[in-house]
Each structure stands twice: as C-alpha cells, then as structure tokens.
Amino acid sequence: MLFDWFTFWAQLLNFLILVWLLKRFLYRPVLEAIDEREKKISGELRDADEGRKQAEQAIREWQEKMSRLDAQAAGMLETARKEAGEEKKRLQGEARREYDELRGRLRESLHEEQAALGRTIAGRIRAEVFRVSDSVLNSLADSGLQAQMARAFSGRLSEGGTEVEELLKSGGTPLVLRSGFEMGEEEKELVRKTLADRFGYKGRLDFMTEESYRGGIALEQGGRSIEWSVNSRLEAIDEASSALLDGPDDEMNEEEGHAGKDAD
C-alpha cells in the first residue's frame, strides 16, 4: 500500500491550523475571563478582611474602656474601705451598687453595638460572597460544568444510603428531579443509572428545570428532598464567618466575669 505524503502533510497542516484557531478564539478569551473573575474575587476578599480588622480594633477599644472602668471602680471601692464604721459600710455598698448599675448599662450598650456591627459585617460578607459566586457561576455555566454538577449529585445519591431509600419509599407523588439548568440525556441517564444500580429503583422519574435551583439539584418525593448545591458550600462559609464574629463576644463576656469576681 502506497503512503500518500501529500495527504499526510495536508492533514497535519489542518490540525495545526485548528489548534491555533482554538487557542486564539476559544481558550484565550475563556482563560482571560477566569483570571479577571479571580482578581475581582481577591479584591472583594481583601475588603472583607479589612472589615474584620476594623471590627477587631473596635473590640480592643471596648476592652480598654472596660479596663479603665474597672480601675475607676477599684479606686471607688478603695476610698470606701477607708471610711470608718457604718458610714464606711454604707458608702461602700452605695458605691458598689452604682458601679454594678453603670457596668451593667455599659456592658449592655457595648454588646448591642458589637452585635449590630457583627450582623452588618456578616451580612455584607454573605451578600458579597453569594453575589460574586453567583456571578462566577453564570459566567462559567456551560455543558461541561452542568455535567460535573450532575456527576456530583449522582455521587451524593450513592452516598445517601438510608436517606435515599426512605425518600424512594415515601411515595404519594411522582419522583421529581429539579435543577437550575436543562439536563442533557447523558446527565439524565447517569441519575437513572445511579438510582437503578445503587437502590434498584426503575420507576418513573420526572425532570424539571427551575430558575430557583440555579447552582443546585434536588430529588424530591412525598415531601422529602435530597439536595446538592453550590449554595450549601457557601452556607458553610457563612457559618464560619458568623462563628468568627461571635468568638470575640464570648471572650469579652468571660473577661468581664473575671473582672466582676476581682471587684467583689
């Protein structure tokens, strides 16, 4: 059999031209868009970190105020101890009551301010993280990402065990899979195969597309639901940020309790 060198070199040239076109008009714009998004997210995270530092600075200032108040209270108590007899006891008790009332009012005021500031910062962080993440999802949404989400949900079903079995046994309504994007036949078949191979389910399965499920997939039947979504990962970040903001408040309460015992 003769080897056609002209055909060989023509096909090689066509392949090189195709590689160049893909790199020039497809891969480069996508990579540039991803880099731009990453830079934007980094900037937003820096802003959030700056807000956290400001909150920590405010907490340190409040702690300094409490220390000064403790020092003033200690001076008042020391003066009262120098008084003689019943007058000394009366003045000491009066000073202690005034101190406790003032301390309580100031502590309540500081806690309210701290809680309000924490809620404001946490709300801004949550809103910005969800906004940026939602924007990234929208900009990167394509069939490849959707296929990955379908595979991730199938993995979630495989690991569901008893939870999935109870949902399949609940009955009463058709088994429905809701998603924020139109699933292709390959993704649908993957979910059906997972239910059949793992749980022996070969019944009816309806697929529905709803905007409210953007970034997630849910399997529902009989009032039960099994979900997988990007938002669930973001909620974990939300809980971590809330715990970080609540931490200084708990430490502050502990320090105040020790200070109160020292004053007694």
Curated annotation (Swiss-Prot):
Domain of life: Bacteria
Pfam families linked to this entry: ATP-synt_B, OSCP
Magnesium as UniProt keyword: no
Keywords: ATP synthesis, Cell inner membrane, Cell membrane, CF(0), Hydrogen ion transport, Ion transport, Membrane, Transmembrane, Transmembrane helix, Transport
Transmembrane parts of this sequence: 2-22
CDD domains: ATP-synt_Fo_b
Compositionally skewed regions (Basic and acidic residues) per UniProt: 255-264
This protein's record includes keyword Ion transport: yes
Gene Ontology CC: plasma membrane; proton-transporting ATP synthase complex
Gene Ontology terms, MF aspect: proton-transporting ATP synthase activity, rotational mechanism; proton-transporting ATPase activity, rotational mechanism
Family note: Belongs to the ATPase B chain family.
The protein, known as: ATP synthase subunit b 1
Record organism: Chlorobium luteolum (strain DSM 273 / BCRC 81028 / 2530) (Pelodictyon luteolum)
Lineage, broadest ranks: Bacteria, Pseudomonadati, Chlorobiota, Chlorobiia, Chlorobiales
